[in-house]
Amino acid sequence: MSLMFLRRAGNIKGRNIRFALQRGSVGYSQQSSEACKNFLNTTQLRTMVQTAALHGPKPMDSSHIKVTNVKELKPLPEWKSLKFGENFTDHMLIMKWNREKGWSTPEIVPFGKLCFHPASSVFHYGFECFEGMKAFRDEKGVPRLFRPIKNAERMLSTGTRISLPSFDPAELAEIIRKFVAHENRWVPDQRGYSLYIRPTFIGTDEALGVHHCDNAMLYVIASPVGPYYSSGFKAVKLCCSEESVRAWPGGTGHYKLGGNYAPSVLPQKEAAKKGYAQILWLYGDEDYITEVGTMNCFTVWINKNGEKEIITAPLDGMILPGVTRDSILEICRERLAPKGWKITEGKYSMKEVAQASKEGRLLEVFGAGTAALVSPVKAINYKGTEYEIPMPEGQEAGPITSEISKWILDIQYGKEPNNPWSVPALP
């Protein structure tokens, strides 16, 4: 599997990308300059990469991975008995970084505990980010990753925000692909089941003080998981946030930081006491819809202009750029827009959703994320009034939600084998 294939799989060529030389190593960040696109893959860039590799700190490199196999493989669990995040594969992957030396050789080692100094920066100042992605087994037995380059890009973006070291996302995606190939037997062979992959990026300086990290670690663990809904879709009720906000302008809501998740647990617990599965996070005097729980939110309605529309909040700095979100938008533009649907990334408020419900224009609402793929919503409590979302009789999801779910699942499980979003993870 070539790195160029992974780049194509993530549509990198269509993005604004810049490689920069940072302290003798190659860094990566998104820029708006059109000229940056034309710079990618040029002779000049290749020369810079080679120079950095020879004379500066070592860049992340997927070409060689050191493997130390466990002495005895664990028995595989019964797939039907799986609980999310409780079973782990035989091995994990570790890469260390030092400002002087650069990236260490990636190592696949037996799964086990990690040991850190009590003053490590990850424990005190929040130098931590993570990703969530999955591998699926197709009908021919081939394990497949879903758009791994997108997760690698997002991890770089998040890590950069908290001053963790740079890397080439294509190298990380390829390293993860090789790790999944090594743990191949842990990828379930039933539709609805998958191998959940958790890359984690942390600062490991052994000293107190808030400053950029001189040492870091990126490690990957994996856990086989069952379907989010064991017996098909299960629509949920939401409760709008009134006292808490998930993110705010100028903050870090659009980064996958661990610190964005812990503060949501207490409000979520209070909502659960009232019988609601998730919180619909709102922002501002207009009660703009941002996210639902830990997922992006989509609304399907007839808008005020009488158009059939699928709308989700824009990436304005408060919204996590979800891989599932991006995939849904792309597939809807490709397959539903030609059928008269308007696909929109734009601000819209809970006030507008409530009004649409009163006028019979509200059709469907669903959350979207890696864990559930899509999570249909059947009711939203807003300022003490519960607004019901219509459902087909005897079903737990509307037709658009169901169709989107099937389209993406078919890609994930290799039903569309030539789709660039599906990356084989063979040894």
UniProtKB/Swiss-Prot annotation:
Coiled coil: none annotated. Its cofactor is pyridoxal 5'-phosphate. InterPro entries: Aminotrans_IV (IPR001544), Aminotrans_IV_CS (IPR018300), Aminotransferase-like (IPR036038), B_amino_transII (IPR005786), BCAT-like_C (IPR043132), BCAT-like_N (IPR043131), BCAT_family (IPR033939). GO terms for molecular function: branched-chain-amino-acid transaminase activity; L-isoleucine-2-oxoglutarate transaminase activity; L-leucine-2-oxoglutarate transaminase activity; L-valine-2-oxoglutarate transaminase activity; pyridoxal phosphate binding. One of its GO terms (cellular component) is mitochondrion. Its main location: mitochondrion. It catalyses: L-leucine + 2-oxoglutarate = 4-methyl-2-oxopentanoate + L-glutamate; L-isoleucine + 2-oxoglutarate = (S)-3-methyl-2-oxopentanoate + L-glutamate; L-valine + 2-oxoglutarate = 3-methyl-2-oxobutanoate + L-glutamate. Residues 1-47 form a transit peptide. It holds the Pfam family Aminotran_4. Catalyzes the first reaction in the catabolism of the essential branched chain amino acids leucine, isoleucine, and valine. This is Branched-chain-amino-acid aminotransferase, mitochondrial.
